[in-house]
Swiss-Prot record:
Binding site for Fe(3+): H28, H76, D165, H169
Cofactor(s) annotated in UniProt: Fe(3+); Zn(2+)
UniProt KW Isomerase keyword: no
Entry keyword annotation includes Protein transport: no
Name of the featured protein: Superoxide dismutase [Fe-Zn] 1
Known EC number: 1.15.1.1
Assigned keywords, A-Z: Cytoplasm, Iron, Metal-binding, Oxidoreductase, Zinc
Function: Destroys superoxide anion radicals which are normally produced within the cells and which are toxic to biological systems.
Length: 213
């Protein structure tokens, strides 16, 4: 029985054009994201088999595989909803996302400073990775994380609310080796309503985290 399932896209393949082509969206969701879902489910089965047989020789690889595939599934599930064909601009109070706008200004000094930091974090990933805006519960502030692969270089307890996929499969068919151009273009499809909802949800869960005895 599968624990994880591939979510449906919240729009059709052409919804984000011309920023992201229909071909990329279809391949990215139906093949790449699906592979992470399958990988997570397969690894859970392999871990269950290892427990049943008490054979732990491959535990290091299995735990690493689970982190890789599960994190890939989670980040992509956020990624699809973080984008919309009528998005872009910046979060503004008049659009009902004023609290997010205030949090960005408090955490980064200005929206321009935040945009520059997240753009640079995503565009300068070495190899495969992500640029992520995350809520950090200890300080109650927003931070930018530069994630290696899907799971490395992450602050424990942080919650991703806006993710930029910097893996080549996210852009190469359209942007070739111009990762910076892709990241710059991504700002035109950011769904600030979705990011704001994730910010509010992340804040509301802070009190349930046992951060200290």
């Amino acid at each position: 029985m599968s624990v994880y399932t591939l979510p449906e896209l919240p729009y059709d393949y052409s919804a984000l054009a011309p920023v992201i082509s229909p071909e990329i969206i279809e391949l990215h969701h139906d093949k790449h994201h699906a592979a992470y879902v399958k990988g997570a489910n397969d690894t859970l089965e392999q871990l269950a088999e290892a427990r049943d047989k008490e054979t732990w020789g491959s535990i290091n690889g299995l735990e690493k595989n689970l982190a890789f595939h599960l994190s890939g599934h989670i980040l992509h599930s956020i990624y699809w909803h973080n984008m919309t064909g009528d998005g872009g601009g910046e979060p503004l109070d008049k659009d009902g996302v004023g609290e997010l706008a205030d949090a960005i200004a408090e955490s980064f000094g200005s929206f321009a400073g935040f945009r520059a930091q997240l753009t640079k974090a995503a565009a300068t990933t070495q190899g495969s990775g992500w640029g992520v805006l995350a809520y950090e519960p200890l300080s109650g502030r927003l931070i930018v994380e530069q994630i290696y692969d899907h799971q490395g270089n992450v602050g424990q307890g942080s919650t991703p609310i806006l993710v930029f996929d910097a893996w080549e499969h996210a852009f190469y068919l359209q942007y070739k080796n111009q990762k910076v151009d892709f990241i710059d273009a991504m700002w035109a499809v950011v769904n600030w309503q979705d990011v704001a909802r994730r910010y509010e949800a992340a804040k509301s869960r802070t009190n349930t985290l046992l951060l200290a005895p």
